[in-house]
Amino acid sequence: MGNEGKEDTLPSKFGRYTLVEKLATGGMAEVFKAKILSAHGFEKQLVIKRILPHLAADRNFVSMFIDEAKLTAQLIHPKIVQVTDFGEVAGQYFIALEYVEGFDALALLRTSAQRQVRIPLPITIFVMMEVLDALDYAHNAIDGGGKT
């Protein structure tokens, strides 16, 4: 298997993707900036969300992850990243997502708190309105079977 998916040796191959940088690790999954290379020099950046290894054997969790991939793939909205692929590599399930360049909101909040500087209210309101627009869409989305 080589260095298949080992984050301590980035960049590393993960199936047809190359994991370039670890972006985050949560309680259930880890997220990587990645790229896919194809014919004639085609290259695309994306994000790989991969189940943590210790959860990969939990059938209930894997089932929830699969449901997440299926549901999220149905959400087509300009403020929601698109699912581009779903699969399994060497027993590790993953979701491939559109990569969106931007700033780290958590880092902004932490820096603001450390410096005791408030984020200007118009910026806060704008960000919240954008998030609420996406949440409203996701909450009211209807699947192919007519269910919300």
Regions of interest found by a model, annotated:
Residues 1-148:
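Conserved ATP-binding/catalytic core of the eukaryotic-like protein kinase fold
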